[in-house]
């Protein structure tokens, strides 16, 4: 009898204008990225509230990645600058909560970078797999 290895659950918040289009391009070019990556399309990376990341961890995510437009290329002018400042604070808060900083990542991927999107997801999935299951999940889960 074989023991099945649990694959990590990864939530990817992707900007509609760049990163989601990059994911679409990766798919159209038949570039593989891990099936355990679940993509959530958002209008802009600045619309990802830090509570969304915490909620993803509460609901069982082993890793969360936020993907947006390159700085200076935001469809909403300065959304990604706001994202960068906001998530610098979130990353330090996650460490305070006992969640390894490697479990969360912020990446810039343009609509023309399908290969970069696939490579980024592959790299992040390997990082999360090496970390193993999120041990803090039981403490973070909502008790109902």
Language-model-detected regions and their locations in the chain:
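Iron-sulfur-associated redox domains of electron-transfer enzymes in respiratory
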Residues: 1-144
């Amino acid at each position: 009898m074989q023991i099945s290895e649990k694959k990590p659950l990864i939530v990817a918040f992707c900007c509609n204008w760049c990163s989601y289009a990059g994911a679409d391009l990766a798919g159209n070019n038949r570039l593989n990225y891990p099936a355990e990556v679940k993509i959530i399309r958002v209008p802009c990376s600045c619309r990802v509230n830090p509570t969304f990341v915490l909620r993803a961890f509460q609901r069982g995510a082993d890793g969360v990645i936020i993907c947006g437009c390159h700085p200076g290329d935001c469809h909403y002018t300065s959304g990604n600058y706001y994202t960068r400042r906001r998530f610098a604070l979130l990353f330090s808060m996650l460490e305070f909560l006992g969640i390894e900083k490697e479990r969360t990542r912020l990446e810039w991927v343009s609509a023309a970078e399908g290969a970069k999107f696939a490579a980024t997801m592959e790299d992040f999935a390997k990082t999360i797999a090496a970390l193993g299951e999120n041990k803090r999940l039981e403490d973070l889960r909502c008790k109902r």
